[in-house]
Amino acid sequence: MKTSVMDLKVEPMDIDFDQPPPLQVFAHTSTLHGISHIFSYEKITAKCCLWVVFFLSSLTFLMYVCIDRIQFYLEYPHVTKLDEITTPVMVFPAVTICNLNSIRFSRITRNDLYHAGELLALLNSRHEVREAHLVEESVMEVLKSKTDFRSFKPRHFNMWEFYNRTGHDIKDMLLSCQFRGSPCRPEDFSVVFTRYGKCYTFNSGETGPPRVSVKGGMGNGLEIMLDIQQDEYLPVWGESDESSFEAGIKVQIHSQDEPPFIDQLGFGVAPGFQTFVSCQEQRLVYLPAPWGSCKSTPPSSDYFRAYSISACRTDCETRYLVENCNCRMVHMPGDAPYCTPVLYKECAHPALDFLVETDSDYCSCETPCNITRYSKELSFVKIPSKASVKYLAKKYSKSEKYITENVMVLDVFFEALNYETIEQRKAYEVAGLLGDIGGQMGLFIGASILTILELFDYLYEVMKYRLCRCSNKKHHNNNNNTDHNAVFSLDDVNCHVSKFH
């Protein structure tokens, strides 16, 4: 019987890959303008070359405009918006006042003179009265009794206690006080220490919610009459940081979240005048980097709950003095020891003056992103008038000369119940950049985002087709090399099987 032959040869599988349409077909179906005239079915003509020039020129202009827009975006420009908003109620600002004389002469004791007499420029290094020929007789008598140190045993001296005890008392300075027509008291002023010593803040917000104004104009804010007590001023026989050539008070109007920085930001008010301060609240909003340079992170200070330039400066000055003098001044926060009078004179005052005037790099305080400040307009009238001086002298049991030299009135009020907003805004964002680029794409080459997707889709199909064809050819060649003789007869199979029986 003739055996049959079974052909067991394995043929490679032929995979059919979809070939992408020709470039001419894609060009005539694409939404990209102009390429249908470039990739045409006809031979290359002058018309085709012109379309190539037009298309490449448009593409060049498009790239130029896109680069310009991207560069403008990377400059992170901003615009400033100014607006005025009316409101029925406004929080009244904090008002800090400081007498320009920080130490009352009558409150100085023998122990004070022993420790701080040289700092106050009253005594020399030998504990003797300086410039005795300039001293008035009444002052000299007081100094003689207090500078007899022959049997004196000095006691402990603390600068904070000294400033607190000898500073002007608001109960003695405040002759009258009204807020929105209602009387206010010395207890409505909280004590705060500054470089001027013991100062006072009205409406600080520390003991309760801050007071508000419901109407603008004079008589709807704070009106105080003060006695600056010039007879308590330290006699000046030389220049020192603790003595003042001026008479009056320093005033700062600020928000409740901002500590007073009155030696740098305050304005002066002189005796013998009524000073009207018309305020308008300004709310400033700045942008952080890269559009601006404001500080948007929480404060790193251990002493202040909110970041402000005043808080940053105070914190920085404190660190500077602790590092250079190993102590702090009375108005500075923290737990470092207070400077002694010797350190005040030899280290603290010179170091702080140097920091304020020259070393601006050490205290680099960024602008906060949100600021509340108050613009001010000041006007003055003479007080007292000839008609009122006798009445005031009788009312307060003072001489007419004393009233003229010491009494002043400060009137702080809102101009109107509105506030001004000054806000920085991003001038060019991602949406604007995409809109400009999309508009230019439509103008120059008639393209959109979907057109770009069409191009990528066609390129993807072409790349996939070429890669798959290349892979299939390699696979076909490998199969031909390894399976060149895979054909067996049925007799060979039977012979192979019989060996196992």
Swiss-Prot record:
GO terms for cellular component: dendrite; plasma membrane; postsynaptic membrane. Glycans are attached at N164, N370. Pfam families: ASC. The chain crosses the membrane at residues 55-71, 430-460. One of its GO terms (biological process) is cellular response to pH. It comes from the Eukaryota. The record marks D359 as: Involved in proton-dependent gating. The keyword Oxidoreductase does not apply. GO terms for molecular function: ligand-gated sodium channel activity; monoatomic cation channel activity; pH-gated monoatomic ion channel activity. It is a multi-pass membrane protein. InterPro entries: ENaC (IPR001873), ENaC_chordates (IPR004724), ENaC_CS (IPR020903). Residues 72-429 are extracellular. Coiled coil: none annotated. A motif (GAS motif) lies at residues 446-448. Keywords: Cell membrane, Cell projection, Disulfide bond, Glycoprotein, Ion channel, Ion transport, Membrane, Postsynaptic cell membrane, Sodium, Sodium channel, Sodium transport, Synapse, Transmembrane, Transmembrane helix, Transport. Disulfide bonds join C98-C199, C177-C184, C294-C369, C312-C365, C316-C363, C325-C347, C327-C339. Its main location: membrane. The record marks E84 as: Involved in channel desensitization. Belongs to the amiloride-sensitive sodium channel (TC 1.A.6) family. ASIC1 subfamily. Forms voltage-independent, pH-gated trimeric sodium channels that act as postsynaptic excitatory receptors in the nervous system, playing a crucial role in regulating synaptic plasticity, learning, and memory. Upon extracellular pH drop this channel elicits transient, fast activating, and completely desensitizing inward currents. Displays high selectivity for sodium ions but can also permit the permeation of other cations. The second transmembrane domain (TM2) is a discontinuous alpha-helix disrupted by the GAS motif, which forms the selectivity filter by adopting an extended, belt-like conformation aligned approximately parallel to the membrane plane. This peptide belt encircles the waist of the channel and divides TM2 into two discontinuous helical segments. The distal helical segment of TM2 interacts with the cytoplasmic portion of the first transmembrane domain (TM1) from a neighboring subunit, contributing to the structural and functional integrity of the channel. PANTHER family: ACID-SENSING ION CHANNEL 1, AMILORIDE-SENSITIVE SODIUM CHANNEL-RELATED. Homotrimer. Heterotrimer; with other ASIC proteins producing channel with different properties. Interacts with asic1c. This is Acid-sensing ion channel 1A. It comes from Danio rerio.
